[in-house]
């Protein structure tokens, strides 16, 4: 990430906003906009910013909610890897279709990693973890795809308004006054 005060401000503001969104009570735990924010951040600011956003999003939330533990390291690492992947995958692809594609791949990667390691942490039978993971992943995919369609382009247009006309056009369809 370039050392511009504006870039660091936008990055930090994104962390705070999405931490507050995750703190909304009574929301499903797997419907959260971390990946939707991480994709445009990684695409605009690069792999380091994508990695840091993923890791810090998980760690700050777990510290704030006093749930920090071994599981935090695993999920933070998985989200960090998603940030690296997003930076490379979205390097020359900045369309809603690209966001949706990465949201699908990223969600399946994240859920597979956490599902396969969950039994190691909690002495849970693998079949039980797999069975419970199906509905969790279905909701997770639904949330991440929806956020990739509606939220990621808006975030991208706020981070880099002049870089991609496809994204800006999609945002202007949602809110014509943005043009």
Regions found by a protein language model. Name each.
Residues 39-43, 83-88, 153, 157:
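Transmembrane alpha-helices and membrane-interface helical segments
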Residues 73, 94-179:
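Membrane-embedded alpha-helical hairpins and interfacial helices in multi-pass inner-membrane proteins
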Residues 1-44, 48-52:
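Hydrophobic transmembrane alpha-helices
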Residues 25-26, 46, 65-69, 90-91, ...:
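Short helix-capping/hinge motifs at transmembrane helix termini and TM-loop junctions
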Residues 18-33, 56-89:
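Interfacial aromatic-anchored transmembrane helix boundaries in multi-pass membrane proteins
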């Amino acid at each position: 990430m370039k050392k511009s005060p504006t870039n660091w401000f936008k990055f930090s503001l994104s962390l705070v906003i999405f931490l507050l969104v995750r703190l909304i009570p009574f929301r499903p735990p797997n419907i959260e906009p971390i990946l939707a924010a991480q994709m445009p951040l990684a695409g605009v600011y690069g792999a380091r910013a994508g990695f840091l956003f993923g890791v810090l999003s998980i760690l700050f939330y777990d510290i704030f909610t006093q749930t920090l533990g071994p599981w935090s390291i695993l999920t933070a690492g998985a989200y960090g890897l998603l940030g690296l992947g997003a930076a490379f995958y979205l390097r020359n692809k900045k369309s809603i279709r690209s966001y949706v594609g990465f949201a699908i791949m990223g969600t399946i990667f994240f859920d597979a990693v956490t599902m396969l390691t969950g039994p190691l942490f909690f002495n849970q039978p693998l079949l039980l973890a797999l069975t419970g993971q199906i509905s969790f992943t279905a909701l997770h995919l639904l949330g991440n795809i929806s956020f990739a369609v509606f939220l990621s382009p808006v975030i991208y247009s706020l981070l880099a308004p002049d870089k991609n006309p496809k994204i800006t056009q999609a945002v202007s369809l949602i809110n014509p006054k943005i043009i």
